């Protein structure tokens, strides 16, 4: 404790996930410092993250040193929400904002398509 990032093998984690295609979801038990591993796991499809939580890393105990603080949980939650927004749908048509911007550019510089 804590797990060093150099001791984490993302390829091994993904290989284990791929060995069990019948599982409907997978997750990680993360004992590293910070939020990087949790975010990487989400990007690769993790449905759950197990991570210790504390309100004070100075409280005695073996897990507090590597436990997440409240602001780190909010950071991961925000990342998950943002990632979900970017990953939802299979839209190829321009958004309303892109269409409006195109009209401004075409109006100013002409249509060069």
Give residue ranges: language-model regions:
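Catalytic cores and adjacent flexible loops of soluble metabolic enzymes
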Residues: 1-113
């Amino acid at each position: 404790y804590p797990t060093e990032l150099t001791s984490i093998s993302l390829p091994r984690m993904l290989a284990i996930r791929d060995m069990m295609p019948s599982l409907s979801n997978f997750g990680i038990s993360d004992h590293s410092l910070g939020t990087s591993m949790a975010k990487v796991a989400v990007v690769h499809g993790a449905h759950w993250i197990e991570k210790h939580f504390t309100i004070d890393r100075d409280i005695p105990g073996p897990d507090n040193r590597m436990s997440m603080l409240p602001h780190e949980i909010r950071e991961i939650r925000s990342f998950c929400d943002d990632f979900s927004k970017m990953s939802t749908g299979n839209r190829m048509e321009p958004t309303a904002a892109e269409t409006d911007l195109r009209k401004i550019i075409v109006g100013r510089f002409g249509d060069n398509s």
